[in-house]
């Protein structure tokens, strides 16, 4: 029942913003009337709120209408706890209250800027003519359509962006596969290029070797006659060495005693050899008879012969070793003589042919350019024994 009392108490507020309640100046019969605290509001706030809404202050004897005058006013007021309670409690009959004077907490929570904009819009709407109102409604409808269109376009753009992302992922995967294939192909081509380069370098080297061989063949083409003459001279040198082998000087060979002592030591061995050759019917009978006569004249000749045979065997072994050493020395001397003969023939040929002709057989064209006659004389002097 508190709502009914509040409704009854709120009716005198419709007399105006500057009106004083009538209960103060009149005597109430039949009881005492207590002033409601609900009506203790700030008069200045009420005037400002009424002026902001563009309404005329209510006069005495006329009740102010509490029904919202437009959709904007209902939007501005919102749904407060007081209004919802009254609507739920009384159904379709709204209370006859001036809600403009109520200091509602839900209204105070709204931003001041929004209140000013909505108040200005309501005021301008209430002051416009009908054609201007229609234009304003049309603009609002156009604005709503534009917003709907922008929302639909935003949705389409979102769908397109999702589709683009999916396509981009597929393209990235495909590009990675193509890139891997290209890398494998690049490696294969690099290996093939390296193999071809190696083959090319090998062919170039073979061509250079063939050119060098051709140049050497051209340089050595006049040498066969000289080679034949060298062979003949070498054979002559070999025959000369064979004929003069026993007259060559012996060096670095240790021999005890002189030549006569060696001959005296060889005499008994030669006699034993002569006897053995006679026994084998190789020696002449006279020599064998002389040996036998000498053996019969001297007593103990058989024992001496045995001793001589033993000595002969020892001497043969020693002479065999000495002959081996002598043969090795003779071979070494022969090689040195051949070397000296070859160097002599080479020097003679170089002097006969000249420096330029002889340098063609020893040096390449690049070396021949830097080769001077002074170096030729130095080389020839170093080759002389």
UniProtKB/Swiss-Prot annotation:
<feature type="compositionally biased region" description="Basic and acidic residues">
    <location>
        <begin position="53"/>
        <end position="75"/>
    </location>
</feature>
<keyword id="KW-0597">Phosphoprotein</keyword>
<keyword id="KW-0132">Cell division</keyword>
<feature type="region of interest" description="Disordered">
    <location>
        <begin position="356"/>
        <end position="385"/>
    </location>
</feature>
<keyword id="KW-0175">Coiled coil</keyword>
<feature type="coiled-coil region">
    <location>
        <begin position="131"/>
        <end position="248"/>
    </location>
</feature>
<feature type="region of interest" description="Disordered">
    <location>
        <begin position="1"/>
        <end position="78"/>
    </location>
</feature>
<dbReference type="GO" id="GO:0005737">
    <property type="term" value="C:cytoplasm"/>
</dbReference>
<feature type="compositionally biased region" description="Basic and acidic residues">
    <location>
        <begin position="1"/>
        <end position="10"/>
    </location>
</feature>
<dbReference type="GO" id="GO:0007098">
    <property type="term" value="P:centrosome cycle"/>
</dbReference>
<dbReference type="GO" id="GO:0000922">
    <property type="term" value="C:spindle pole"/>
</dbReference>
<comment type="function">
    <text>Contributes to mitotic spindle assembly, maintenance of centrosome integrity and completion of cytokinesis as part of the HAUS augmin-like complex.</text>
</comment>
<dbReference type="GO" id="GO:0051301">
    <property type="term" value="P:cell division"/>
</dbReference>
<dbReference type="GO" id="GO:0008017">
    <property type="term" value="F:microtubule binding"/>
</dbReference>
<feature type="modified residue" description="Phosphoserine">
    <location>
        <position position="100"/>
    </location>
</feature>
<comment type="subunit">
    <text>Component of the HAUS augmin-like complex. The complex interacts with the gamma-tubulin ring complex and this interaction is required for spindle assembly. Associates with microtubules. The interaction with microtubules is strong during mitosis, while it is weak or absent during interphase. It is unclear whether this interaction is direct or indirect. Interacts with EML3 (phosphorylated form) and TUBG1.</text>
</comment>
<protein>
    <recommendedName>
        <fullName>HAUS augmin-like complex subunit 8</fullName>
    </recommendedName>
</protein>
<dbReference type="GO" id="GO:0051225">
    <property type="term" value="P:spindle assembly"/>
</dbReference>
<feature type="region of interest" description="Disordered">
    <location>
        <begin position="107"/>
        <end position="128"/>
    </location>
</feature>
<feature type="compositionally biased region" description="Polar residues">
    <location>
        <begin position="375"/>
        <end position="385"/>
    </location>
</feature>
<comment type="similarity">
    <text>Belongs to the HAUS8 family.</text>
</comment>
<dbReference type="GO" id="GO:0005880">
    <property type="term" value="C:nuclear microtubule"/>
</dbReference>
<feature type="modified residue" description="N-acetylalanine">
    <location>
        <position position="2"/>
    </location>
</feature>
<keyword id="KW-0498">Mitosis</keyword>
<keyword id="KW-0131">Cell cycle</keyword>
<dbReference type="GO" id="GO:0070652">
    <property type="term" value="C:HAUS complex"/>
</dbReference>
<keyword id="KW-0206">Cytoskeleton</keyword>
<keyword id="KW-0493">Microtubule</keyword>
<dbReference type="GO" id="GO:1990498">
    <property type="term" value="C:mitotic spindle microtubule"/>
</dbReference>
<dbReference type="GO" id="GO:0005813">
    <property type="term" value="C:centrosome"/>
</dbReference>
<keyword id="KW-0007">Acetylation</keyword>
<keyword id="KW-0963">Cytoplasm</keyword>
